[in-house]
């Protein structure tokens, strides 16, 4: 990648699209200082949206707690006149303040969620200056940070900070659509569209059109069907009822608009949705299974951490993302567990289009972890400790001692659902992983079911299981696998992780994994043996979801199916496909 490139130029928000769009990705000026004040001198250029810690940014420097990362660039307003001009950030890690032409236009905290500022009043007619100041405490704070650490090694990776998703401008009408909530109902064969405008309370008329394959199949042009709260429900005709599934990921196109007065002010946005239904129900033998559209489905997938060697959280291109996801699908997988990270919106859009199901982790945070307890001791003594209660007495051990930390998690959970709920690919929320920052898991399940009643919840992936949610979620790297059906559906939500550092591909400083192969042939053989001799027999014992560790190598971890650079598949691809076909056939026979 060269600094002259314009990275990630694609429209960043496919589920709420307008024709007006101008990317601000590219070269910005930067400086790292000890002060929040505008620096007197810039240190050089940084390629946005790559964090300064990454090679792709051209900087290669780690932001320390207490330091300020400053960005600066000039820009012209989007083409057109009138209305409002919005400045969007896909994600900035962690806290930032934004100025335009010396005017503070807003601030934000939270490193994984999009935010927007109306900068109209701060704009000049032609030349404008944008300044962003960022702080990121990484492990010194309680905020969501995932696998980031200032001391990387093993299963934890280099910290990154600042802008790591697309920055962009758009021109909108005065009373524009701020948010669009699309709620499909599989059983009723309807879709309810709700729009919130920038100036609520007025006599805004909402209209919506649904198309399937370019053909208009349902529409409402502001008739009495439109509610006064800005919502409209449309019926999907029987002949155009196409359920979404991995084998047939059909997406309906949706256009939504508003009019006001005598159509003097209006907005039009484009989106999409799918009709699909998640549930847990007994199979023909009475064993609980995950069901998609009322049919048992084996969820066969991979743990996906979403790291790239040059950009860490940020991919080299949209094409690289699509290629990886397509290859995963071609290998016979239908599930990705998005682990300790929230991706840019386009990643979920591609999963929607390709038919890849996503189990979405809440990004872990809290006070510094006592890894000797939550990771190492519990992993080894899992039979004794995996159901340890996450009550107030243990909040210190689980890194949620402070009220501020717990309140931060509550805000982050709601922000995650708000940002991602429109994506059909997401089938399950995972509020906690292996006790990292876990507290009151039962309350988290209740909150998620209230915010989003149409999806499943894996209360505590691995441990500490409180007996709630929809999933009996097991991690197993070391013990013989003995499962049995119960009142929740059984998932092996982490396992495998066989390491092999493939020669010629990003050699690690240290090799990390769960058992090490010495060659491609050995890796392929061990993978096949694990899947067919250990995992497959457990299907009859209720096993309904598999999450092998992992998609790709990441830093020291060399237990991926792909190399870190995504240039090679480490085991024999034909063998992986054959194994997945065998698992699917065995599951179909088991549930009959």
Residue locations for each model-derived region?
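Accessory carbohydrate-binding/adhesion or oligomerization-edge regions at the termini
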Residues: 1-58, 133, 137-141, 213-215, ...
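Accessory beta-strand-rich segments of carbohydrate-active enzymes
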Residues: 4, 12-15, 29-34, 61-176, ...
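Conserved, mostly hydrophobic/aromatic
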Residues: 28, 102, 167, 252, ...
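Beta-strand-rich binding/interaction modules
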Residues: 98-100, 189-224, 232
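Signal that preferentially marks extracellular ectodomain short beta-strand elements
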Residues: 117-121, 233-249, 532
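Surface beta-strand/loop "capping" patches
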Residues: 171-201, 284-289, 582-591
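N-terminal carbohydrate-binding accessory modules
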Residues: 180-181, 255-328, 582, 587-589
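Substrate-binding/catalytic cleft of secreted carbohydrate-active enzymes
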Residues: 335-580, 586-591
């Amino acid at each position: 990648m060269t600094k002259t490139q314009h990275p990630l130029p694609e429209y960043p928000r496919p589920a709420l699209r307008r024709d007006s769009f101008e990317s601000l990705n590219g070269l910005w000026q930067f400086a790292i200082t000890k002060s929040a004040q505008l620096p007197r001198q810039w240190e050089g250029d940084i390629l946005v949206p790559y964090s300064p810690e990454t090679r792709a940014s051209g900087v290669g420097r780690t932001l320390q707690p207490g330091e300020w990362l400053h960005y600066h660039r000039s820009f012209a307003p989007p083409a057109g006149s009138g209305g409002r001009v919005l400045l969007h950030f896909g994600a900035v890690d962690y806290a930032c303040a934004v100025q335009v032409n010396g005017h503070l236009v807003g601030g934000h905290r939270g490193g994984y969620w999009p935010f927007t500022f109306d900068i109209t009043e701060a704009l000049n007619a032609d030349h404008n200056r944008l300044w962003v100041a960022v702080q990121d405490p990484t492990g010194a704070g309680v905020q969501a940070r995932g696998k980031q650490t200032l001391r990387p090694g093993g299963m934890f990776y280099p910290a990154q900070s600042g802008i790591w998703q697309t920055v962009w401008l758009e021109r909108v009408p005065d009373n524009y659509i701020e948010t669009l909530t699309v709620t499909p109902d599989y059983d009723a064969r309807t879709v309810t569209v709700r729009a919130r405008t920038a100036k609520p309370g007025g006599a805004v008329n909402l209209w919506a059109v649904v198309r399937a394959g370019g053909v208009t199949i349902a529409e409402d042009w502001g008739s009495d069907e439109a509610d006064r709260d800005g919502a409209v429900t449309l019926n999907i005709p029987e002949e155009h009822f196409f359920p979404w599934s991995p084998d047939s990921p059909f997406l309906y196109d949706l256009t939504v608009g508003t009019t006001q007065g005598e159509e003097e002010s209006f907005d039009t946005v484009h989106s999409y949705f799918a009709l699909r239904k998640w549930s847990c129900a007994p199979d023909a033998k009475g064993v609980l299974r995950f069901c998609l559209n009322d049919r048992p489905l084996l969820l066969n997938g991979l743990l996906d951490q979403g790291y790239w060697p040059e950009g860490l959280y940020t991919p080299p291109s949209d094409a690289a993302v699509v290629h990886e996801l397509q290859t995963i699908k071609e290998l016979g997988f239908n599930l990705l567990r998005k682990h300790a990270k929230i991706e840019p919106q386009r990643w979920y859009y591609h999963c929607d289009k390709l038919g890849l199901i996503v189990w979405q982790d809440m990004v872990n945070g809290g006070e510094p972890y006592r890894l000797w307890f939550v990771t190492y001791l519990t992993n080894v003594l899992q039979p004794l400790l995996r159901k340890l209660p996450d009550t107030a007495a243990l909040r210190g051990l689980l890194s949620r001692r402070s009220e501020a930390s717990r309140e931060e998690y509550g805000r982050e959970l709601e922000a995650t659902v708000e940002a991602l709920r429109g994506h059909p690919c997401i089938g399950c929320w995972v509020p906690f992983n292996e006790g990292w920052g876990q507290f009151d898991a039962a309350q988290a399940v209740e909150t998620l079911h209230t915010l989003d009643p149409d999806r499943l919840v894996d209360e505590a992936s691995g441990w500490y299981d409180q007996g709630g949610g929809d999933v009996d979620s097991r991690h197993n790297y070391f013990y013989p696998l003995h499962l049995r059906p119960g009142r929740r559906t059984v998932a092996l939500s982490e396992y495998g992780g066989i390491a092999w550092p493939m020669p010629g591909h990003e050699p690690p400083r240290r090799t990390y994994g769960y058992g090490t192969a010495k060659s491609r042939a050995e890796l392929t053989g061990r993978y096949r043996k694990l899947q067919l001799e250990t995992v497959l027999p457990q299907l009859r014992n209720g096993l309904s979801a598999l999450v092998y560790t992992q998609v790709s190598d990441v830093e020291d971890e060399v237990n991926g199916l792909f190399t870190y650079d995504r240039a090679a598949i480490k085991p024999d691809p034909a063998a992986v496909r054959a194994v997945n076909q065998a698992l699917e056939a065995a599951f179909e026979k088991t549930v009959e």
